[in-house]
């Protein structure tokens, strides 16, 4: 039975784990790859203390980001309705569609805060009217906004 060594990862390693994880690996893997390339360090009490400190700071940072996302969701709720103007043809059918990029621009104009278009989920919109759009602000915070599509 081969002896295993414990190391703490300094960065994400695809087959092992994420930054800060303590993992057991074969001694040769640690000695020949992880340690020389700076991807891991051997486990010592000092390293464990650093890992705990880093995890606490990361938890604080995540809590602050969540609070910021909650405040932004409240701001979006107070605005109420966002309006997108699109060119239409007969029977209020849009030329094209409303994309998540269009919604991101409208939110940015109204709030002066940038929202990544990839975090916006827009239903298929091909007509004028009112729609519900989902905006992911944080991994645990999602806002539902009212989107009004009008012709110009």
UniProtKB/Swiss-Prot annotation:
Name the gene for this chain. Answer: rplI
Regarding protein family, the annotation reads:
Belongs to the bacterial ribosomal protein bL9 family.
What is the official name of this protein in its record? Large ribosomal subunit protein bL9
Native source organism of the sequence = Synechococcus sp. (strain WH7803)
A single GO BP term for this record reads:
translation
Please provide the record's keywords in A-Z order.
Ribonucleoprotein, Ribosomal protein, RNA-binding, rRNA-binding
Cite a GO CC annotation.
ribosome
The function of this protein is:
Binds to the 23S rRNA.
Q: Which GO terms describe its molecular function?
A: rRNA binding; structural constituent of ribosome
* Disulfide feature: none
State the SUPFAM superfamilies in the record.
L9 N-domain-like, Ribosomal protein L9 C-domain
């Amino acid at each position: 039975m081969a002896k295993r060594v414990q190391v703490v990862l300094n960065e994400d390693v695809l087959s092992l784990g994420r930054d800060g994880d303590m993992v057991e690996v074969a001694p040769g893997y640690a000695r020949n790859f992880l340690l020389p390339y700076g991807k891991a360090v051997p486990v010592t009490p000092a390293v464990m203390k650093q890992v705990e400190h880093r995890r606490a700071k990361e938890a604080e940072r995540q809590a602050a980001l969540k609070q910021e996302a909650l405040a932004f969701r409240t701001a979006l709720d107070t605005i109420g309705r966002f309006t997108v103007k699109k060119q239409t043809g007969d029977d209020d059918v849009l030329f094209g569609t409303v994309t998540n990029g269009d919604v991101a621009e409208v939110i940015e104009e109204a709030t002066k805060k940038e929202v990544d278009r990839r975090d916006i989920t827009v239903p298929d919109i091909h007509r004028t009217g009112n729609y519900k759009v989902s905006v992911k602000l944080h991994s645990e915070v999602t806002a539902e906004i009212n989107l009004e599509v009008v012709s110009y």
